[in-house]
Amino acid sequence: MAHDFSPATSTEALVRAGQHSQLRHQEEASGVAGTGRLASTAFTIAFSREAGTYGAAIARAVGNRLGWPVYDHELLQRVAEDLGVHQTLLESIDEKHVGWLSECLESFSSAPTVSEFAYTRRLVEAMLSLAAHGECVIVGRGAAQVLPAATTLRVRIIAPLEYRIEAVGREHGIAREKAARQVEATDRERRRFIEEHFHFDPSDPTNYDLVLNAARFSQAECAELVIAALDRFRARHASSPERMQKAL
């Protein structure tokens, strides 16, 4: 029987191996190797967000409150350094599904390029490495789908479409029609990226621990709710680590 070594399959295998490696690292670091228990401080918050919800700003507010580093575009810098390319080279494929045709055409170019799969592989490795040490906030890029559920608080920020269009229009000083196109395009690209590489529907609320409507709460209130959820997440883990372990 032929084996499928497609980029998507390879990425999934990397994610699974990385998750188990991360948990072993955390057990060893906390002196509980082989017990099924995890280090009490090895938690990560992973944000997923619809376009125009100020998800990145909320994530930074959470990081500031906790004193944790926040990785958004900073992830691109880490991946660029690993690949030995300039960060701007990755921005055209960041959270986008470029497709095989684009990659084939780029292969004929003399300019330095990075394939979508190479970027995604290094991205997954970078996120797993960060989460292995815990106490960090990661924005987008499949973190909520990639990182182990047992040690990751997975947050989704949403809002009604009209709210998001108005937010993007204000932020960029553009007309409503252009803002609407930008919101639709960004949502589509992010969705395709997650579906193609990780086989998850990013809009499915069951993939998250907390879903917040940014139109109903201020950024500061959203940050407070996330931190409150983290406190409960930690408390539940402390009281029943075996139960949390089963979340994997």
PLM feature spans:
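NTP-dependent small-molecule kinase module
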Residues: 200-248
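Conserved phosphate-donor/acceptor-positioning beta-strand/loop module used by diverse small-molecule
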Residues: 150-170, 176-184
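Small-molecule kinase domains that catalyze NTP-dependent phosphoryl transfer to phosphate-bearing small molecules
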Residues: 8, 17, 100-103, 175-219
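Walker A (P-loop) phosphate-binding motif
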Residues: 37-53
